[in-house]
């Protein structure tokens, strides 16, 4: 019987690449969700015939409802944030793949876990903003949390030897360095949205591409790694690997290092999460070592790229510190993409939010949303 998948965020970059994998493996799509892209999700409905579709934007939901009217095979339409949670909770799928962007993914992740579903997680904000809540829920409900980020998938793959995993002493979290690698503050001062959106290796959405340019993406991934693998931040070293071939590595107590390599294509970690624990032939070409010639490794510059420094501060503060950093970044990136602030303002604002409070202590889901709101408000007040 074909594996059934609910895919949250099916029209985005990770969502469409996930459908490439689903198509190649002959999996069944149980449910899809999107925000506004009606035409795109209509094409997906035509091909994959899901039982349920959620449109979180009400106007888009109305347009989709009209487009599906009268069709005998039309999926049941869910709407709004409550519809997204309903979709994540529904019995039927073997795996829920959360590829939503932003803090909106946290509630859906928790709902999927609490409903007993294994969760393939591409929404990094789930762990960044609510890592304590997510890991507690995973332990309570006995489900699997399968990382989809290329770096965390690489680490996860390197730790599959259950005998060696307890001897883990260090994680080497790789970064491409983004389009501005090697540049200093003065050079970055005049960088524009168009400059920042030119990633050297990966094909990603606008928000995550900006995060790669500021190194915020790597800061968020550092926070994720703390929650996923149980090491303190000082045991996680960020290494710039410009070719994006070494996706991350782990070091053990005997100082041996195991790394995962592959072409820079998100369909590799997506497929591993969906086929785990099996490995099967996929849609990505093999790595040609002869063509590589050279692999380079450098230190990440958190003196220049202040988003990375802010994330390190945030995870050391604990509590809602990472949530505050994430909310500030989401708001600052939105303003940058609207040409309302400069490139360096993103790091300035994120660091200012992290420095503004202690953020310690346990928290609830309501606390997460309130912290996110306050961080965004802080950014708007300190332009």
Predicted regions and their residues:
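Catalytic, metal-anchored helix/loop core of enzyme active sites in primary metabolism
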Residues: 1-383
